[in-house]
Amino acid sequence: TKHDMFECLCANQSKTLVAIRKYLVNVGECEESFDVCFRLLTIKECVQRIARFLRVNPTEETELAYYTSLQTFSYMLPFKAEKGMEGKLSVMNIAYMNDPNEGRTLQKSLFAGEIPFEGDIRHRKDARYPYVFIKCFTPQIDFLPMWEMYGDYARGCCLVLDWSRIRTQKMEVPLYHVCYLSSDVEDFHVEQQFNANLTSYKEMEEELHELAALCDLLYRKNDAACLEAMHSILNEILYLFKDSSYAYEKEVRICYQYPGVDEAFRHTSGEFCKLYVATDFPVAIKEVILGPKFLNRSE
């Protein structure tokens, strides 16, 4: 019966159902909540399919790098690394991402240009950020636009990872392609020219349009509890989409997500602490490339 389903979902402690369980606890048992719950479960399934589309399984031939400042790189080294961080990457919370459109691109596509998860623009912006942690990589190695944007204005370094050594540890890395969305007056698109790494860009576009239709049905209910649950479910993929103007980056991301405060959370030292987690695997670096404007390069 529906009552049994309600009791079962409320009692289920699976982390994947946290958002739906919280919604049911908030609104209680009624015909409307069962309908919303079914649609939220359908959205969850669609989100999981999209995440699988974007998943990267690196091979020994995979060449990915990330650009950083020399100071940040130094914190990975034994003489400066915090306890337990030797040879590991710091994966920062999305609150510190330098692109103001992070998480917005997919929202605009799904909700006809609106950004519902940031609240009413007439009121103060909600400063709370989800427990989503991102590390960005690219196959664009020693590439000038990447140096200027992410390599401390070409004064930093480009770290090329050795995936053959990482793979020998047989640990699952939550690595995803970024999907680049283009748009016209009427709709959004997943174009092959911007997404050469996707196995089926057409299938991805179809999944996104199905997701948009599902989200629209719930968004029109104008229900705060429903919107919160939908936001929590969509967080799994919100930060895996960017505007097609960034397609030259060919970005790949490690993405860790947590439903709440977790013992894995760390804070940087200093006056203004920043929230991060460590990769659950040690990183093997194949090559360190110094930027074209690296100070004292000849030394």
Task: Name each region found by the language model.
Residues 2-299:
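Partner-binding and oligomerization surfaces adjacent to conserved cores of proteins
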